[in-house]
């Protein structure tokens, strides 16, 4: 199994970061204590024998330019030993090979395959002429985006109020939350049911615990319990926030809050749907995913949508093209780089290893506004950054869906 997983990770379907230049190889001594800003690993991380996503090649080891660690760099964390029985990193989905490019920013994301009737991310800013990153629901790209639209002027967010309330509140506009997900395989069942921890990153390597999630063992489909209490991951716990549930093929994931389906007074709400494209032909490449979110009101509050009691939920609205109260996001299409023979995205130094899990979510109206990005930094550590209109719980659940096995996406 371990040899099979290593062979799967040697395929060119991994997504790497595009914000680094290749230079002459450096010795292992010179690389110690430096932070790498790379193609999410090429070629230093990809050639490392310890890298879980390494690409086997007959050429010599190539290295990458390094820079001194900045105040916002990831603090060094101890790597956890992965279990040989874990197969969460195997799956991939087809994607068209795009023309090679030295910079991802030089090629705009093609939106021809997106629905053009998705609700805007922020209806309150539709009529704002000050270079807002939001447009009308026509689906056309914004021609003149301000620096804030691309997130360059966003302030780093912090937890405000009780953690149980903060994790479900949409992020304020102009605020970027930088988080880290740690996968702990040391739990029960030989690592087959790891626990995932979400922390909000702070200055000087500090972090604040936000959420924890674990897959339920006795369930017909993948079912993750997400809680603010890492010591009690059950639906009866006081810290229970919601759950992530998949269909039998692992191609569609539903995110619900803590409400109960049969409770008519406080029905369970749909907070997100994650749809992964199927790959029945076995093509190799990064995953294609669609994320559906409830629309936002003019005062930046989430529209309440429930699929309980035979009501039309997020997925039903999307299928019937009733998109007035639905926000549709897609993963930003990576660019194929001939030099590194890999798919690349610009993660701005936040991702340091190639992985099929690495992705960025954007809206049809402005592909430059990264709503969420997620990627690997070591064997069991991943970064997760999100901004408006997502909340921490939605972003964490979307990230958890990328860990789950997908039969039809293999």
Curated annotation (Swiss-Prot):
| Keyword Cytoplasm part of the UniProt annotation | yes
Where is this gene product found? Cytoplasm; Nucleus
Signal sequence interval, chain numbering: none
What PROSITE patterns is this protein classified in?
TUB_1, TUB_2
Q: Mark out the compositionally biased spans (Polar residues).
A: 47-72
Start-end of Basic and acidic residues biased regions: 132-143
**Where is it found, in Gene Ontology cellular component terms?**
cilium; cytoplasm; nucleus
Q: What is its main location?
A: cytoplasm
Q: What is this protein called?
A: Protein king tubby 1
The uppermost taxa in this organism's lineage are: Eukaryota, Metazoa, Ecdysozoa, Arthropoda, Hexapoda
Encoded by which gene? Answer: king-tubby1
């Amino acid at each position: 199994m371990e040899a099979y997983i290593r062979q799967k990770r040697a395929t060119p379907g991994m997504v790497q970061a595009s914000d680094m230049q290749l230079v002459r190889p450096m010795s292992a001594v010179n690389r110690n204590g430096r932070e790498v800003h790379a193609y999410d690993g090429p070629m230093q991380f990809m050639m490392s024998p310890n890298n879980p996503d390494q690409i086997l090649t007959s050429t010599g080891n190539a290295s990458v330019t390094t820079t001194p660690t900045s105040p916002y760099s990831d603090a060094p964390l101890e790597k956890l030993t992965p279990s040989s029985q874990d197969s969460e990193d195997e799956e991939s989905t087809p994607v068209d090979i795009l023309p090679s490019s030295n910079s991802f920013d030089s090629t705009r994301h093609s939106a021809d395959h997106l629905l053009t009737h998705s609700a805007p991310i922020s209806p309150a800013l539709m009529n704002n002429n000050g270079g807002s990153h939001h447009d009308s629901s026509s689906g056309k790209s914004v021609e003149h985006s301000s620096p804030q639209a691309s997130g360059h002027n966003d302030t780093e967010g912090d937890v405000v109020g009780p953690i149980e309330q903060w994790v479900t509140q949409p992020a304020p506009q102009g605020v970027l939350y930088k988080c880290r997900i740690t996968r702990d395989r040391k739990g029960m069942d030989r690592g087959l049911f790891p626990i995932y921890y979400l922390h909000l990153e702070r200055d000087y390597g500090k972090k604040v615990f936000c959420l924890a999630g674990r897959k339920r063992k006795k369930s017909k489909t993948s079912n993750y319990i997400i809680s603010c209490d890492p010591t009690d991951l059950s639906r009866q716990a006081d810290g229970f926030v919601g759950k992530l549930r998949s269909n039998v093929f692992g191609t569609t994931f539903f995110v619900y809050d803590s409400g109960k389906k049969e409770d008519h007074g406080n029905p369970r709400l749909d907070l997100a749907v994650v749809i992964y494209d199927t790959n029945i032909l076995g093509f190799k490449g990064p995953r294609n995913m669609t994320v559906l979110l409830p629309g936002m009101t003019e005062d930046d509050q989430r529209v309440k949508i429930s699929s309980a009691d035979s009501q039309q939920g997020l997925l039903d609205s999307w299928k019937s093209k009733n998109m007035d109260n639905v926000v549709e996001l897609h993963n930003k299409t990576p660019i194929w780089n001939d030099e590194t023979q890999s798919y690349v995205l610009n993660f701005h130094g936040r991702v340091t290893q190639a992985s099929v899990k690495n992705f960025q979510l954007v809206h049809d109206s402005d592909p430059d506004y990264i709503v969420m990005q997620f990627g690997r930094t070591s064997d069991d550590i991943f970064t997760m950054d999100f901004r408006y209109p997502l909340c921490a719980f939605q972003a964490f659940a979307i990230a958890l869906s990328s860990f789950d096995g997908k039969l039809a996406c293999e």
